[in-house]
């Protein structure tokens, strides 16, 4: 089963806003799991994931800010 979250062309501003909202939701989820966890190894893995998400967002923003015209975004959840 697939759930289509995003599919379309967006202005650079809107593309950045959409990506920022989604990535921040994922970061908030990971932070919540860190707060619930007593497992140090699990917390460290989640902290690494947060840093990776932050870097991905930074890189994507930088890329989008240097593009002209509309940006195509596509994202889906694939349930297996």
Name each model feature, range by range:
Residues 1-80:
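Extended, charge-rich alpha-helical interface modules
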